[in-house]
Amino acid sequence: MEDFVRQCFNPMIVELAEKAMKEYGEDLKIETNKFAAICTHLEVCFMYSDFHFINEQGESIVVELDDPNALLKHRFEIIEGRDRTMAWTVVNSICNTTGAEKPKFLPDLYDYKENRFIEIGVTRREVHIYYLEKANKIKSENTHIHIFSFTGEEMATKADYTLDEESRARIKTRLFTIRQEMANRGLWDSFRQSERGEETIEERFEITGTMRRLADQSLPPNFSCLENFRAYVDGFEPNGCIEGKLSQMSKEVNAKIEPFLKTTPRPIKLPDGPPCFQRSKFLLMDALKLSIEDPSHEGEGIPLYDAIKCMRTFFGWKEPYIVKPHERGINSNYLLSWKQVLAELQDIENEEKIPRTKNMKKTSQLKWALGENMAPEKVDFDNCRDISDLKQYDSDEPELRSLSSWIQNEFNKACELTDSIWIELDEIGEDVAPIEYIASMRRNYFTAEVSHCRATEYIMKGVYINTALLNASCAAMDDFQLIPMISKCRTKEGRRKTNLYGFIIKGRSHLRNDTDVVNFVSMEFSLTDPRLEPHKWEKYCVLEIGDMLLRSAIGQMSRPMFLYVRTNGTSKIKMKWGMEMRRCLLQSLQQIESMIEAESSVKEKDMTKEFFENKSETWPIGESPKGVEEGSIGKVCRTLLAKSVFNSLYASPQLEGFSAESRKLLLVVQALRDNLEPGTFDLGGLYEAIEECLINDPWVLLNASWFNSFLTHALR
């Protein structure tokens, strides 16, 4: 490209471009496309000015170079191509002698006939996009903009093209020639793709014809034309008095602005009532795994084979019995369902060849547990039109529940490290493009911090269960299929490990719509005695099914093994999102990355290495009643990941509403902390909107409690 530039352009232009690049500290050996762009822009500016003069009568005339009248006054003053100091001297001189307004940015030319500065643009993109970028950067009515493209298009302020058609045609022909020459040498594609936009884009262009008529018709009441409305909008001072803005609005808007002070906000009111209960689709901190290391059995990787192999590792099975009944369920059916699973697994083991999948016998206990024949009969609406008292059945309001300590314990546990590795390096995704070294480094550091995290185990468990359940729902719609709940990991030594958490039995699953529900019964192993926190296990029937020998510092001890059984349901859309729980890794990585970027911009260098390797530095993790909690960067990574995972596990309309409404209050509080003197109206309405989302969801209640801690410490 450098050779092409030196051959293609006048040596004077090349020299000016070299000086300009040197002035801005750019290396023309590296930035060859920029070198070509500067030369092109300089040549267009010179061609724009060439042959244009002003005669004694003040008229613009075009005169060829060898004309004796060439001593006439030049129409254009060339500013582009001068060093910055000299260029500003020329601009100041023009402003002083002509009374023109001083521009914020150095323009390219001054037109003595029209008495205006001109900004010349040469773009490899679409002219209107580049024009908008230029207009928004300059933000001046007094600088005229004229854009040329390499395809022969042009655009100018108010469609005023300044020059005669022949002069503009010369410029377009020259640009087209440059493009052809570059293309012949295989340089054009690289040059075209290398153009960077101006800083910002603001669409401020003339609207004409049909669009103009539509714009005039679409105005709010009391505005006669688009110009009036624009003037009104421009008159809205962004930091002006809110009351003034409100007074300009419709008479129906009646809002009194109250100053928001440190004493203004009150805590969010959490509901009273019985403690909230566990509602996740699978057990979290209370789950127990039956595991096999370095699996190499026949059929390894087939879920049913893996499950049977894991079940064989436990020898403490005993006659199951109910230790915590479900208050409203037929608990004997849950007990019989587990016995049926054990019996049918035993039958499989007695067969010569283990099948790849297992469909359970449709016994009365499973039919009850899976809600078979329980759905009300659907009747076509047209057949009901004549029924006078036809109405939707009454549904009870959900019972209010209070915050319980178990959900905070669940979250704390999700942030902890386990002794297994749950994701490989490529779980977040390999580099698709030759991405910069820094991005890969950040990903590797982040993966190292979260690969052992319990929240990561929940991701892999959720992905597996949802994938298996969705597959079975589509492949075996009428069957009560037995689905093992499995995960895979590596030990610290790198040995592979397969884990069995329990089983799911899927009900009938003719899922036509995304929201159609498939019922399932989950049966999950645990060492947690449900009688310690019975309120947490309201939806479960818990059986004692065996005794497990555990090694501890004082020797072996026996602990009862429980089975948590419940009826549950999910839908195609929920399973689809459950299968994509790995997104949580990406979301939390991006949050960490924005922290690194903020730090790097302060230090003016990439801080990734220091960020992760400076073990002595602590970072804010969150608020608690004790104040701002701080921890290592690894703890921050794991906490952000756990929050993202819990948002997925406990997704609900209550969470959506609380997040959206509490964010508004958060922004006002942050504005107060930044001394921006915020004002509010209808703060009571905002609190009402937040508090109507606090019903019974444990994760939402915990977030509301955290928000109250934040309010307390933020407003001290």
UniProtKB/Swiss-Prot annotation:
It is found in: Host cytoplasm; Host nucleus. Phosphorylated on serines and threonines by host kinases, including human casein kinase II. The keyword Manganese applies. Its EC number is 3.1.-.-. Its main location: host cell. Pfam families: Flu_PA. One of its GO terms (molecular function) is metal ion binding. Disulfide bonds: none annotated. Its cofactor is Mn(2+). It comes from the Viruses. Mn(2+) 2 binds at residues 80, 108. Gene3D superfamilies: Influenza RNA-dependent RNA polymerase subunit PA, endonuclease domain. Mn(2+) 1 binds at residues 41, 108, 119-120. A motif (Nuclear localization signal 2 (NLS2)) lies at residues 184-247. A motif (Nuclear localization signal 1 (NLS1)) lies at residues 124-139. Keywords: Cap snatching, Endonuclease, Eukaryotic host gene expression shutoff by virus, Eukaryotic host transcription shutoff by virus, Host cytoplasm, Host gene expression shutoff by virus, Host nucleus, Host-virus interaction, Hydrolase, Inhibition of host RNA polymerase II by virus, Manganese, Metal-binding, Nuclease, Phosphoprotein. HAMAP family: INFV_PA. Influenza RNA polymerase is composed of three subunits: PB1, PB2 and PA. Interacts (via C-terminus) with PB1 (via N-terminus). Plays an essential role in viral RNA transcription and replication by forming the heterotrimeric polymerase complex together with PB1 and PB2 subunits. The complex transcribes viral mRNAs by using a unique mechanism called cap-snatching. It consists in the hijacking and cleavage of host capped pre-mRNAs. These short capped RNAs are then used as primers for viral mRNAs. The PB2 subunit is responsible for the binding of the 5' cap of cellular pre-mRNAs which are subsequently cleaved after 10-13 nucleotides by the PA subunit that carries the endonuclease activity. This is Polymerase acidic protein. It comes from Influenza A virus (strain A/Memphis/110/1976 H3N2). The gene is PA.
